[in-house]
């Protein structure tokens, strides 16, 4: 990456990643406090609602939707040749650990904080709405800013990935 002049971009991407992890951790922590102090009434009422179709179908669709939210796996493969021996498997492991912790945690909190009928009203800004419920307007704003940064990081990652792809195709 340094030879391509993208060293600064990798620092920006690392900063965006750190901010994102801290924001998600804060959402989970404050959401857990909210549920602890306000009870599980919303969660239990959400679990009582009937599912459309079967439970396996609901789990499949939920898993598929969660996979759409995972970014970075496809881009990290572009850097295999530039990484030291054994780094790429560690990178994948670390990404899977983060996804395994954050995705189920946030999904559980969504069920515990937001009544299902209310989800449709906030489908474009559900995490920000969860932040507003759990921590107030300041957390909602922080989550919105974080979302903007993450989208910017995705564009940056795509640029780096395309650059690697073009380099391999021209060799």
Each model region followed by its residue ranges:
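Juxtamembrane helix-loop transition segments at the membrane interface in multi-pass membrane proteins
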Residues: 163-171
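Helix-loop-helix junctions that connect adjacent transmembrane segments
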Residues: 14-72, 78, 101, 111-125, ...
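Membrane-water interface regions at transmembrane-helix termini and the short interhelical loops
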Residues: 1-19, 78-82
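Hydrophobic, membrane-embedded alpha-helices of multi-pass small-molecule transporters
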Residues: 49-94, 142-155
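TM-loop-TM module centered on a large, flexible mid-protein loop between adjacent transmembrane helices
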Residues: 91-153
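Juxtamembrane loop-transmembrane helix junctions in multi-pass integral membrane proteins
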Residues: 4-11, 52-55, 87-90, 131-141
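Transmembrane alpha-helical segments of multi-pass membrane transport proteins and ion-pumping complexes
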Residues: 3, 66-74, 99, 103-108, ...
């Amino acid at each position: 990456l340094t030879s391509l002049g993208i060293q600064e971009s990798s620092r920006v991407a690392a900063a965006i990643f750190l901010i994102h992890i801290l924001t998600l951790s804060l959402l989970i922590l404050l959401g857990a406090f909210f549920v602890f102090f306000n009870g599980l009434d919303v969660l239990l009422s959400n679990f009582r609602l009937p599912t459309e179709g079967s439970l396996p179908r609901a789990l499949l669709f939920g898993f598929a939707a969660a996979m759409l939210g995972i970014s970075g796996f496809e881009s990290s493969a572009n850097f295999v040749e530039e990484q030291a021996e054994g780094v790429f498997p560690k990178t994948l492991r670390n990404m899977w650990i983060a996804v395994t912790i954050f995705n189920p945690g946030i999904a559980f909190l969504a069920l515990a904080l937001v009544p299902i009928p209310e989800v449709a009203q906030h489908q474009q800004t559900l995490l920000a709405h969860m932040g507003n419920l759990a921590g107030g307007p300041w957390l909602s704003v922080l989550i919105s800013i974080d979302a903007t940064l993450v989208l910017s990081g995705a564009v940056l990652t795509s640029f780096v990935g395309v650059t690697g792809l073009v380099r391999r195709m021209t060799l």
